């Protein structure tokens, strides 16, 4: 399926000079959303995934239906102050600035094969931080899946050595 026809291009959002790729039209179209999910599920099955991990918030939108289809758990990666129990955290840079990501300390068992999902690969900061959290807890990053990659931001360079699936590139 041509997923680009279901991704809206929004200039100057969230600030001037940024060209935002909006995946909500894809989510609004049941067939497109299912097709995207099915491609990621097929990719995950080849990697014997034990757990899906996704950074907030759009990583949840991609990861939860994938974890449901695989019948494995989903572990959310959240911003500081959003998880109620004991956490580990990492500072990171992203396309629009700096932030902190966290995960529950008991979310991943050592040796679990993890699929990381997110909507977009831009500079790679969010995914690099998510990888750090997964690996600090002893998880094995068995794959990383994105709907969209902004190739001109060269985030893929931060993912060298990891297996990556991207459904559409800009």
UniProtKB/Swiss-Prot annotation:
* Pathway this chain belongs to: Purine metabolism; AMP biosynthesis via salvage pathway; AMP from adenine: step 1/1
CDD domains hit by this protein: PRTases_typeI
Q: Name one GO biological process term.
A: AMP salvage
Enzyme category, top tier:
transferase
- Report a single Gene Ontology molecular function: adenine phosphoribosyltransferase activity
Catalytic activity annotation? AMP + diphosphate = 5-phospho-alpha-D-ribose 1-diphosphate + adenine
Single GO cellular component term? cytoplasm
Question: What are the alphabetically sorted keywords of the record?
Answer: Cytoplasm, Glycosyltransferase, Purine salvage, Transferase
Q: What NCBIfam families does this protein map onto? A: apt (TIGR01090), PRK02304.1-2 (NF002633), PRK02304.1-3 (NF002634), PRK02304.1-5 (NF002636)
| Assembly | Homodimer.
Q: What is this protein called?
A: Adenine phosphoribosyltransferase
According to its UniProt entry, this protein's organism is Bacillus cytotoxicus (strain DSM 22905 / CIP 110041 / 391-98 / NVH 391-98)
Q: Which gene encodes it?
A: apt
